[in-house]
Amino acid sequence: MNATALLDTISIEQISQFLYSEARFLDDEQWDDWLECYAPQASFWMPAWDDNDQLTENPQTEISLIYYPDRQGLEDRVFRIKTERSSATMPDTRTAHNISNIEVESRDGLQITVRFNWNTLSFRYKNSYSYFGMSRYVIDFSGEQPKILSKYVMLKNDYINQVIDIYHI
């Protein structure tokens, strides 16, 4: 099948199923499967809101809530979670990710930019928390499995009373 024909076969349903799988891997703490959703060069960025209530624009020069320039940073984070070397994740946090309003913003060959809203419910220390926002992914569909090339997360309720981590969003 040529690339043009393959592009025409990538449906919003397939994109949605990929996004749902990534969320499920977080909810089920299937860390290795979750990492497999990401290309080696994948960036992961959640900018912070500045004092003027504007999002920061450069992860290299401004503060971010989370920033990993490539998958290696995610691998290190997962290693710490799995080996209980992260006090921020002890005890385990139970999560339920919900995704809505999935929209294809652009297609560039087999790379598709997707925007969606999300809400994550979290339970830890006998307390429930809710996080919500918008994410924009660039996903490469050229291989056997789709891979995230870029994950941008806008956390819309950033006044929180605990550490935010990769599994909250």
Swiss-Prot record:
Residues spanning the membrane: none
Catalytic activity: benzoate + NADH + O2 + H(+) = (1R,6S)-1,6-dihydroxycyclohexa-2,4-diene-1-carboxylate + NAD(+)
EC numbers: 1.14.12.10
Enzyme class: oxidoreductase
UniProt record, GO biological process: 3-phenylpropionate catabolic process; benzoate catabolic process via hydroxylation
Subunit (UniProt): This dioxygenase system consists of three proteins: the two subunits of the hydroxylase (BenA and BenB), and an electron transfer component (BenC).
UniProt family annotation: Belongs to the bacterial ring-hydroxylating dioxygenase beta subunit family.
Protein name: Benzoate 1,2-dioxygenase subunit beta
Organism: Acinetobacter baylyi (strain ATCC 33305 / BD413 / ADP1)
